[in-house]
Amino acid sequence: MDYMRIFSVFVVTLWIIRVDARVFGGRGIEKFVTFGQNYIVTWGQSHVSTLHSGEEVDLYMDQSSGGGFESKDAYGSGLFEMRIKVPSGNTGGIVTAFYLTSKGGGHDEIDFEFLGNNNGKPVTLQTNLFLNGEGNREERFLLWFNPTKHYHTYGLLWNPYQIVFYVDNIPIRVYKNENGVSYPSKPMQVEASLWNGDDWATDGGRTKVNWSYSPFIAHFRDFALSGCNIDGRSNNVGACESSNYWWNAGNYQRLSGNEQKLYEHVRSKYMNYDYCTDRSKYQTPPRECY
C-alpha cells in the first residue's frame, strides 16, 4: 500500500476542509500581524534581526548568545501559528523553540522544540507540556520532511476542551481536558527562542555544540494568531472559555474525522518516543495517557 500517496490525499483533503470551514463556515481566520505589532525581543538583542518590515525575524546563535522574543500580550485561549525554518547543517545541541508559557512559579507551558543534529541525521521535533510546573510529557517525531530546507507552519490550539499541536495543519498531538487531568490554567504568552541545549538535546547530551559551524540561524515569519487577550483582566483564564470565540466552538472541541485519520497515521509512522509508554519514567502512566 502506498502510504505516502494516501497521506498526501489526506493532507489535501484536510487543507480543503480547514479552508472551507474557516472562510465559508464562520469558524474564523487567524489574524496575521507583523513582528512589531505583537512581539518584543526579550534577550539576545544583537542576535535578533527583523526583516521585510517586520514580516520575518531571524534568530542567531553563536558561542556568545542566542536570542528570543515574546508576545506583548498574554492569552487565555486561542490558535497560535508561525512559519519556521530551523537551522541547517551540523546543529547538534542547538534547540529552536516555539511555545506558549505563563510567568511565575508553577508555570504552564506548551512546547514545540526542534532538537538539532549532526552529520546529516534528521532534526527531531519534541513536543512537551508543563502543567503547574510539572513537565516530563515529551513526545518526539521524525517529520515526513526536512524542517531545515523550507518554511513549515506550526500551530498550537489551546481551548477549554483540548490542546492540539499542528504541523502544516496536520494534528500530531492532542491533549484533552478530562476529569482528573492537569490542564493549563494561567494566562500564557507566545514565545520563540534559539538556545544551547547540548546538556540534553542531542543523543541525551552526549553531542555538544560545535561552535565552528556557528552562527546557527532560525527563521520565523507569518505570525498568525487568534487569541483571547487576557491583559487588563483577572488572571483567570475562565474569562476566555466562551464559545463565542470561534476557536472554542464545537468544531474545535474535537478532531474532525479527517483530522483523526491524519493524526493516527502521523503517530503510527513518525512518532519515535511517547512518555506514556516509557516505563523507565512512569511505572504507572499518568492519567491523561489512558
From Swiss-Prot:
It is found in: Secreted, Cell wall; Secreted, Extracellular space, Apoplast. Disulfide bonds join C228-C240, C276-C289. The active site is at E109, E113. Glycans are attached at N210. It comes from the Eukaryota. Predominantly expressed in flower buds. It is an enzyme of class 2 (transferase). Contains at least one intrachain disulfide bond essential for its enzymatic activity. It catalyses: breaks a beta-(1->4) bond in the backbone of a xyloglucan and transfers the xyloglucanyl segment on to O-4 of the non-reducing terminal glucose residue of an acceptor, which can be a xyloglucan or an oligosaccharide of xyloglucan. Gene3D superfamilies: 2.60.120.200. Induction: By auxin and brassinolide. InterPro entries: Beta-glucanase/XTH, Beta_glucanase, ConA-like_dom_sf, GH16, XET_C, XTH. One of its GO terms (cellular component) is apoplast. The keyword Ubl conjugation does not apply. Xyloglucan binds at E113, Q126, T127, N128, N136, R137, E138, D199, W200, G204. Belongs to the glycosyl hydrolase 16 family. XTH group 1 subfamily. Catalyzes xyloglucan endohydrolysis (XEH) and/or endotransglycosylation (XET). Cleaves and religates xyloglucan polymers, an essential constituent of the primary cell wall, and thereby participates in cell wall construction of growing tissues. This is Xyloglucan endotransglucosylase/hydrolase protein 3. The gene is XTH3.
